[in-house]
């Protein structure tokens, strides 16, 4: 499930460092988190949709790797992002 343009723009303005910032880890993690929450809601209704479940696991792994990178590079930005998004630190893959 992909995000529509309005949602992407809203996430970029909220988490980006400048206009059109799509590459920073904060924006990427925020977009992945939104897609993960959307897929989680979808799977609550469609319990046997195994293709979407696999996609969800791939997205969670991708988000975990981005969070590990951010924790290694700048722990303050990592902690601020985890607090803003409400992600558990254990799920983020950093100590």
Curated annotation (Swiss-Prot):
Pfam families linked: Ribosomal_S15 (PF00312)
GO molecular function, one term: structural constituent of ribosome
CDD domains listed in its UniProt record: Ribosomal_S15p_S13e
One cellular-component annotation, GO: cytosolic small ribosomal subunit
Superkingdom of origin organism: Bacteria
Listed InterPro entries: Ribosomal_uS15, Ribosomal_uS15_bac-type, uS15_NS1_RNA-bd_sf
Keyword field: Ribonucleoprotein, Ribosomal protein, RNA-binding, rRNA-binding
GO biological process: translation
HAMAP family named among the record's database cross-references: Ribosomal_uS15_B (MF_01343_B)
Annotated function: One of the primary rRNA binding proteins, it binds directly to 16S rRNA where it helps nucleate assembly of the platform of the 30S subunit by binding and bridging several RNA helices of the 16S rRNA.
UniProt similarity note: Belongs to the universal ribosomal protein uS15 family.
Assembly description: Part of the 30S ribosomal subunit. Forms a bridge to the 50S subunit in the 70S ribosome, contacting the 23S rRNA.
Protein name: Small ribosomal subunit protein uS15
Protein's gene: rpsO
